Amino acid sequence: MKSQGRPLPSVAEQFKARLPVYIGLTRLNRPIGTYLLLWPTLWALWLASEGAPSLKNLFIFVFGVLLMRSAGCVINDYADRRIDMHVERTKGRPFAQNQVTEKEALTLFGILVGVSFILVLFTNALTIYLSAGALALASTYPFMKRHTYLPQVVLGAAFAWGIPMAFAAELDAVPQQAWLLYTATVVWTVAYDTMYAMADREDDLKIGVKSTAILFGEADRAAVAGLQVLTLGVLFMVGAQHELGVYYQVSLIIVAVLFVYQQHLIRDRSSQHCFKAFLNNHWVGAAVFLGLVLEFLFRP
């Protein structure tokens, strides 16, 4: 078909033209969220398999993390489509710039979730059953900031959900150790996402968005410190349960140093420093994973 003498663009051409918008909507150009979701999932795969996860499960979970994090960003922007324009850090996002429609975003969300579910079908019945929890958490988190001061707890539950799924995929069971690691990840997520919320606090107060940063108020730094100490304590318990040795313990020392550095960054509560402290948590996840890899690699 032609329009005014010109051929209509093909579906592929239309998609190519929209690709920069979709990349912005899924945050593929900002991988920090993917890293923070991926690290605990890799911890679980390594612990469940004692350092030797199947290549099939490794592919499924790495690709699944990328897809579900992208889906989470899409539904988050859909939920925040009327408020992102009022927040300095988010006013450049596709919805805030009127670059994407609601139908487009929901369609993209459905595609990403659908492909993720297809991946899960190659695991086992227990993992498939648990995947329903992942979808429920990813879909509800964006709306929590309007109803509770604890949306970070829901985010933590969502970001840690790959842990029971990874154990289920490797062992066809979710042992008690998995839930201890899950707890550590939830607490850690609340800590770093509180720092993220501290960066947006002034804008959030103006538009009525709730967060732990607002809940904690002037006690925010102390609350984050307490959560970080608790994270270390639970991770130490995880190591004790799995009889992990020096490499893992050294990784926890590195994590402690990184937490101290983050406290140094947020001491003035500036948006720039709080966001930098949030980003630094990528190295926390990487340090723990490296400790686990070395632990199982050199285990007698």
Swiss-Prot record:
| Natural source organism | Hahella chejuensis (strain KCTC 2396)
Transmembrane stretches in the record are 32-52, 55-75, 108-128, 149-169, 178-198, 222-242, 246-266, 278-298
Q: Which of UniProt's keywords are assigned here?
A: Cell inner membrane, Cell membrane, Magnesium, Membrane, Transferase, Transmembrane, Transmembrane helix, Ubiquinone biosynthesis
Class of enzymatic activity (EC top level):
transferase
Q: Which GO terms describe its cellular component?
A: plasma membrane
PROSITE patterns associated with the record: UBIA (PS00943)
Q: So what EC number does this one have?
A: 2.5.1.39
Q: Which family does it belong to?
A: Belongs to the UbiA prenyltransferase family.
Supply one GO BP term.
ubiquinone biosynthetic process
Q: Which HAMAP family match?
A: UbiA
Protein name per Swiss-Prot or TrEMBL: 4-hydroxybenzoate octaprenyltransferase
**GO MF terms held by the record:** 4-hydroxybenzoate polyprenyltransferase activity
The record's listing under CDD domains reads: PT_UbiA_COQ2 (cd13959)
Q: Which PANTHER family match?
A: 4-HYDROXYBENZOATE POLYPRENYLTRANSFERASE, MITOCHONDRIAL, PRENYLTRANSFERASES
Q: Where in the cell is it found?
A: Cell inner membrane
Gene that produces this protein: ubiA
